[in-house]
C-alpha cells in the first residue's frame, strides 16, 4: 500500500478543494493515486450535492465582469450569508461572471456547460463547491449586456455585493454612468420608462396607493386633520391629452375663483401643471428610472438630470440577492435540530 504523505494530501487538497480528512480518506481508498482520488471526491461531491438539491438557497452574492464592450452580471446563491463571505465562494462568483461574459450563453443550461479556468464545467464547479463548502451553491440568473464604442458602462455593487447593477448610457461618461447605477441600486427601478409598465399593474398599484391614503386619513381624522384626496392617476400613460387639458382648465377655474388676474396665469399654470403631473405619476416614480427623483440632486428627476448632461440610458440590469425567493422561516430549536440532522447525514 502506498504511503499517504502530508505532501500528497496537500496536493490533493489544492487540486480538489477538499478538506484534510476527506482528502486523506480518498487517497487511502485509491492507494495514493491522485487522479483516482480526485474522481472519487467528485463522485462523493455529487452525492452530497444531490442531498442538498432541495434546500432553499436565498443568500449569496452578485458578480460583475466588464471587458471592452461586454459586461455580465450574475447572481450566485448559497444558503447562508456566512458562506457568501467564504473566499472560495467569492472566487467562484467572480469566475462565473467572467466565463459568462466571454461565453455569452443564452440560458442557465448553456451557462452551466461553459468551461472554467480549471478545465471543468461550471456545473461541475458548483457541485464541487456544494460538497466542499457544505451548502447548496447554485447559479440563479445572469445577464450579458453589450454596448457600442460610443457608449459607457456603469458598473456598481452595493452592500458587500448583495446588489449588482450595470447600466449602459449614451453620451456623458463612465462617471455619469456609475452615478446612474448607484441611483438604480438605491431606488430599485424595474423598468426605464412608463411605457414599459403593464396597464393592469398600474391600476393595481394605484389601488394600493389609495388604500394607504385611506389608512392615513383614519389617523388624520383622529387629530382633526383634513382628509387627503384619492389619486385619480398613477402613470403618465394614463395622462392623456384630454386629461391634461382638463387639468389645465381646472387650474384656470381655481385661479379665477381665487381672484387671480388673468395676466399672471401664464406664470402660475406651468408650476401647477408640474405639480399635477408629479402627484399623478406615483407609480412611475416607484418603478421607472426616468421618473424617479435623482438621488444625487433631488431638484431633478433622473430624466431631467440626463438631459442636463446630454446623456440617455440605453438599458440597465439590477440584481439583488434573494429577491423573489421565499425563504424558509424556522424557529431556533428547529434550526439547530435541522443542522444536527444534516451533519449526521453528511
UniProtKB/Swiss-Prot annotation:
- Which InterPro entries does the UniProt entry name for this protein? EF-Ts_dimer_sf (IPR036402), Transl_elong_EFTs/EF1B (IPR001816), Transl_elong_EFTs/EF1B_dimer (IPR014039), Transl_elong_Ts_CS (IPR018101), UBA-like_sf (IPR009060)
- Subcellular compartments: Cytoplasm
What Pfam families does the entry give?
EF_TS
Region listing for Involved in Mg(2+) ion dislocation from EF-Tu, in residue ranges: 80-83
- List the Gene Ontology MF annotations in alphabetical order: translation elongation factor activity
Keywords for the protein's UniProt record, in alphabetical order: Cytoplasm, Elongation factor, Protein biosynthesis
Q: Which domain of life is it from?
A: Bacteria
For this record, an example GO cellular component is: cytoplasm
Task of the protein: Associates with the EF-Tu.GDP complex and induces the exchange of GDP to GTP. It remains bound to the aminoacyl-tRNA.EF-Tu.GTP complex up to the GTP hydrolysis stage on the ribosome.
Entry similarity comment: Belongs to the EF-Ts family.
The name of this protein is: Elongation factor Ts
Amino acid at each position: 500500500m502506498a504511503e499517504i504523505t502530508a505532501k500528497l494530501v496537500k496536493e490533493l487538497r489544492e487540486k480538489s478543494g477538499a478538506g484534510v480528512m476527506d482528502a486523506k480518506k480518498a487517497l487511502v481508498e485509491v492507494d495514493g493515486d491522485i487522479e483516482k482520488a480526485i474522481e472519487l471526491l467528485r463522485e462523493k461531491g455529487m452525492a452530497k450535492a444531490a442531498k442538498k438539491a432541495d434546500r432553499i438557497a436565498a443568500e449569496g452574492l452578485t458578480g460583475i465582469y466588464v471587458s471592452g464592450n461586454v459586461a455580465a452580471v450574475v447572481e450566485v446563491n448559497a444558503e447562508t450569508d456566512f458562506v457568501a463571505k467564504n473566499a472560495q465562494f467569492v472566487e467562484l462568483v467572480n469566475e462565473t461572471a467572467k466565463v459568462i461574459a466571454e461565453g455569452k450563453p443564452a440560458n442557465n443550461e448553456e451557462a452551466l456547460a461553459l468551461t472554467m479556468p480549471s478545465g471543468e464545467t461550471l456545473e461541475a464547479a458548483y457541485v464541487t463547491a456544494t460538497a466542499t463548502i457544505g451548502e447548496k451553491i447554485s447559479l440563479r440568473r445572469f445577464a450579458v449586456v453589450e454596448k457600442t464604442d460610443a457608449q459607457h458602462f456603469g458598473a456598481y455593487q452595493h452592500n458587500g455585493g448583495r446588489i449588482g447593477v450595470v447600466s449602459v448610457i449614451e453620451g456623458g461618461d463612465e462617471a455619469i454612468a456609475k452615478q446612474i447605477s448607484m441611483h438604480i441600486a438605491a431606488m430599485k427601478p424595474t423598468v426605464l420608462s412608463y411605457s414599459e409598465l403593464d396597464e393592469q399593474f398600474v391600476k393595481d398599484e394605484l389601488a394600493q396607493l389609495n388604500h394607504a391614503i385611506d389608512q392615513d386619513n383614519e389617523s388624520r381624522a383622529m387629530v382633526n386633520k383634513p382628509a387627503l384626496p384619492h389619486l385619480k392617476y398613477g402613470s403618465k400613460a394614463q395622462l392623456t391629452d384630454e386629461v391634461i387639458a382638463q387639468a389645465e382648465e381646472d387650474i384656470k377655474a381655481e385661479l379665477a375663483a381665487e381672484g387671480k388676474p388673468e395676466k399672471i396665469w401664464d406664470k402660475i399654470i406651468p408650476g401647477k401643471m408640474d405639480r399635477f403631473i408629479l402627484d399623478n405619476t406615483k407609480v412611475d416614480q416607484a418603478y421607472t428610472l426616468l421618473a424617479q427623483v435623482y438621488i444625487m440632486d433631488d431638484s431633478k428627476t433622473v430624466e431631467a438630470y440626463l438631459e442636463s448632461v446630454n446623456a440617455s440610458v440605453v438599458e440597465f440590469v439590477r440584481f439583488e440577492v434573494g429577491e423573489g425567493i421565499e425563504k424558509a422561516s424556522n424557529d431556533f430549536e428547529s434550526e439547530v435540530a435541522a443542522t444536527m440532522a444534516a451533519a449526521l447525514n453528511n
